[in-house]
């Protein structure tokens, strides 16, 4: 088997496994959706629901937007310094940086 046939065989097997995986996902989603619709008919939960109602207090938050701009000036501190971005962060050495991919 020559190298091209090996590459085509590996690609075909990979593509077949991907198709099988997608098919299994579709089947799993279908079974889940059908199972939820079948079992979702007004069942009572065994949970205890506690509701706290206070009829005397009503809290509302009203937010109104106006066409205003808020500009906040921040003073620059004298102690700030910035990195020199013209130099590399780490000095890489070796031949792998200049090699070809194939």
From Swiss-Prot:
Residues on Intravirion side: 1-6
Modifications after synthesis and translation: N-glycosylated.
The keyword Chloroplast belongs to this UniProt entry's keyword annotation: no
Glycosylation site list: 46, 54, 84
EC number: 3.2.1.18
Stretches of the chain forming a coiled coil according to its record: none
Co-factor remark: Binds 1 Ca(2+) ion.
Subcellular location(s) of the protein: Virion membrane; Host apical cell membrane
Keywords assigned by UniProt, alphabetized: Calcium, Glycoprotein, Glycosidase, Host cell membrane, Host membrane, Hydrolase, Membrane, Metal-binding, Signal-anchor, Transmembrane, Transmembrane helix, Virion
Region entry Head of neuraminidase, spans: 89-102
Virion surface side: 36-102
Domain of life per record: Viruses
Known partners and oligomeric status: Homotetramer.
Function, as annotated: Catalyzes the removal of terminal sialic acid residues from viral and cellular glycoconjugates. Cleaves off the terminal sialic acids on the glycosylated HA during virus budding to facilitate virus release. Additionally helps virus spread through the circulation by further removing sialic acids from the cell surface. These cleavages prevent self-aggregation and ensure the efficient spread of the progeny virus from cell to cell. Otherwise, infection would be limited to one round of replication.
Free-text note on domains in this protein's UniProt record: Intact N-terminus is essential for virion morphogenesis. Possesses two apical sorting signals, one in the ectodomain, which is likely to be a glycan, and the other in the transmembrane domain. The transmembrane domain also plays a role in lipid raft association.
Note: The influenza A genome consist of 8 RNA segments. Genetic variation of hemagglutinin and/or neuraminidase genes results in the emergence of new influenza strains. The mechanism of variation can be the result of point mutations or the result of genetic reassortment between segments of two different strains.
Name of the molecule in the record: Neuraminidase
